[in-house]
């Protein structure tokens, strides 16, 4: 992420309080979210960052509060976001960051409930308390809580976000960073002709994916698939594993109705590291 992009993103988050980082697989959404939180804090304080992952079974009871089985029957238990907000309210001079991975996998209306209104930037604070569903407690979202949602744009099985929720978030798209100054320095440190050749091939593949009417830029392959190497550790086996077990299966899903295209690009990827 460039310095200009970072400044834009921090400005959005400060103003809106709620941001969704969206992008193709492997563009570094999780890394960017945590880095954004720590940089806005000015210190790496993991105690002020919480991350949850939404899924189809995730509910209001997990997020806010609900009754859970206990030895004596059922008892009211507090959810992750409720507990996080209470902690932030007791420390209102410092910023807190709540990260939601796969935010578009959950039933958002069901999960957020009455908090749809409370997460808005101008509905924060004690003066906007609302009564919770089960406990009848009057609850508010503190102004020092920032929400960062992460959304994979290449998952075709997911519905579009609820418009009511979409209005309450700013959306920031992360793209593959192969041409960024940071990744260029990383390539120089890796110092591998085969690695460079594979990255160049993937860049051409991304051009093909972006121009495909059934796919588009949201399906491009991110740079994170190729991170983690240090100088001298790149070998044919590790690059081949990325191709065979990560990239080619993905292409099989993308072009399930065009196996010839999958075959041609699979061969191109394999040739790139020969």
Regions of interest found by a model, annotated:
Residues 1-274:
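C-terminal regulatory/interaction module of P-loop NTP-utilizing enzymes
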